[in-house]
């Protein structure tokens, strides 16, 4: 079981580092967009505080193996890993100076934030894929956006310079 715990710790380290890196990249794209639909930021909140700080791989693996060992009985009783890199809350906040958690925003603001994140990810994919076009399918977005945000959505689509399909049941 010790070798399995070591493998879990090593893979968890790589997942943690990757997740942190791509969250930073998405946040940079969200900050650098000139026509953001809604300005927002993503924060990762791990239940296991070991994942709170970036530390060297060897130290991380060593500390995580110790935690896995201490929690073997709990994990056995619950029939799952309780301290995994998967135990995370993803918090999204709207705004730049006075940030508001997404859970306190209107459903329209939440949808606008989601669209902003989708465009940030699409931009990242396009940049990392030799500028090849991405294909976006945006379903029922117009029904939830006011005129100002609809214009911003159209501008985002133009700036992305890729294929986009907007679907919905209303004529807007």
Language model feature labels by segment:
Residues 167-169:
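H-loop/switch region of ABC-family ATPase nucleotide-binding domains
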